[in-house]
Amino acid sequence: MTLDEIKRSIKSGEIKSDTVVIEKGSLTPTSGGLIPYTVFHGWNIASSYECDESWGRSNLELFEYIEKQNFDDKQLEETLASIQTEDHHWNWFKKSVGTTGEDYKWFYLYAEGKPQAACLIYHPKDSALENSNIFYVEFLAVAPWNRSCLVRERKYLGVGSVLLKTALSFSVNNLGLSPGFSLHSLPQASNYYLKLKMVNVENRNKDALLYFELSQLEAKKLLGAT
């Protein structure tokens, strides 16, 4: 079956997912109040395709809006610099096709019927900080409308952190891994991981991608333990 045939099967509803609900809670919109969310675990190529479609459309709408504003060079430069687009080329559909093994785990966070964030992890991964096995975040992204920029208010706060915490809890309780995780960070995301108190392990950096790991102590704090 070709990729185009798979996409047609997704649209027709022929392809079924094997996801299960592993968490429910509430997100905080920037406009106030609370909105319920659901985190699904499991391989779901339809959800990955939905991420590509809805997130790509959102980015296109944002850039079309910017184009109509007639910004001067300085305003345009500042506006574009405020937009996190380093992962815009990620193709979640193709990532799903290539990651069907048991050593990969998928997580999707939905609210109001839309994918708000997605995460793919690999396990086990040796810890660089402790003598233990943790997981490695292959890819983590939130929807474009959940990112700060100068011309669009972020819709929901803390979506990425919610999904990371859910994946961490799942890895400890269901995969038998030690608390903690690691990843290679895109440059624009490094400050976020530093705020999580992740440690940069320099000998595992890859060119411009810094290697971060969350220690067991900080992971337990993230999970609500002491």
Regions found by a protein language model. Give the residues of each.
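Mg2+/Mn2+-dependent nuclease catalytic core
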Residues: 157
